[in-house]
Amino acid sequence: LSAEECGVFLEKLFKFRGFYIQRRTIRQYSYDAAAHALGDIGEVSAKEMEADEEGYYIRGDYVGKLGVEKSYEKYLRGEKGIEILLRDAHGRIQGHYMDGEYDRPSVPGKNLTLSLDIDLQMLGERLLKNKIGSIVAIEPETGEILCLVSSPNYDPHLMIGRQRGKNHLMLQRDKMKPLLNRALMGVYPPGSTFKTAQGLTFLQEGIGTEQGP
């Protein structure tokens, strides 16, 4: 809702007890790429609330569902703030209880920097367009993941906003299985490409020579 639309609703909300306007943050993605690596967020489920030992989540909260969003949920979510407000008989805010003595400001989530090279990631996705497969590029010296491509993939923007449920169901029913992260969940024989690494290991350990065993 726009600020103007919210203003109209707020003027009439006192007539509808139990209804209120709640702000929430919606993820924005700078690139239409790396959907499998980044993951997505969605409304917390009853099962996730039961598993929440801290009691942090309530109905309507959003939580990381897949990928980095899920793995680093506790770091990205921040901490909730608390405001105790006084209202009149019509539900209109009159001020803060005890002048805000028991209020607590919210704490924003931490920033997370990935090792993904977005140019390399987008190149990999272009190379696998209309194909089935995966590409993983790893920096040998550090072990950093430079790209993590799974194809078919999907636009991460499909998993935000009010159409998330509809879009997720559409992707789930797709016979090409775009939700499957083939780079991590697929099992494929390495084939002849593995012989190069195996041969170098043998040479390094002195097991064989360049001419043969």
Residue map of PLM features:
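Short active-site loop at a secondary-structure junction
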Residues: 113, 168, 172-194, 211-213
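Periplasmic/cell-envelope proteins involved in peptidoglycan metabolism and beta-lactam response
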Residues: 1-165, 187, 204-212
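Extended, hydrophobic alpha-helical segments in both membrane/secreted and soluble proteins
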Residues: 145, 193-203
